[in-house]
Regions:
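Juxtamembrane "helix-exit" motif on the non-cytosolic side of transmembrane helices
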Residues: 38-46, 107-115, 174-176
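Residue-level detector of alpha-helical segments with a strong bias toward transmembrane helices
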Residues: 43, 157-159, 171
Length: 181
């Protein structure tokens, strides 16, 4: 499997669909979740909160995988059956996107731990560039998964971003209200 999602996303997502591995994608997501929990442990959070952060990262990946799978079924021009291999491919593509999240966390570690006054500003600029690159790779991943034109992929990309944001916002509200109880 090719992990070069940064410079060759089309080939990476294509090979991820051909050689889909749910375990590899889950390992990437778990590493990302553990790294995020490590960052929050530096703030003095308790172990329960750190475990919830790892679970939250896994939930984000799972929601994105389910949405990619659903949009693949809805917007592909062919009649498809609900096949487990298709979900594995969508989950693998979402796992490949999580390499960007790992890169974001490394940038936060590098620029967030420096004492220079200009380093956080440079870090914010780098985070913005990485965020835009991740959105572009999400579009490319959708285009590869759907095997469609740019117009259809752009529509699915917009719908995916909106629905993904709404679902995660609702899940965050429910989770925070459960914690407050």
């Amino acid at each position: 499997m090719d992990y070069n999602v940064f410079t060759k996303p089309t080939q990476t997502f294509g090979s991820a669909i051909e050689d889909s591995s749910l375990l590899r994608a889950l390992v990437i997501v778990l590493i990302s979740g553990l790294l995020a929990a490590f960052f929050f442990s530096l703030t003095g959070m308790g172990n329960l909160a750190l475990g919830l952060i790892v679970v939250w990262v896994i939930v984000q990946w799972f929601v994105l995988s389910v949405l990619l799978f659903a949009f693949e079924i809805l917007f592909s021009g062919q009649k498809r059956q609900f096949v487990r291999a298709d979900f594995k491919a969508a989950a693998t593509v979402a796992g490949q996107l999580w390499l960007w999240v790992l890169l974001l966390e490394v940038v936060l570690l590098v620029f967030g731990s420096t004492l220079f006054s200009m380093a956080p500003m440079i870090g914010i600029a780098v985070l913005i560039v990485i965020g835009v690159a991740m959105l572009i790779d999400l579009f490319i991943g959708i285009r590869v998964v759907l095997d469609s034109s740019n117009g259809r992929a752009f529509l699915v990309w917009l719908l995916l971003l909106i629905v993904y944001g709404l679902i995660l916002s609702l899940a965050g509200i429910i989770a925070s209200s459960m914690i407050l109880l």
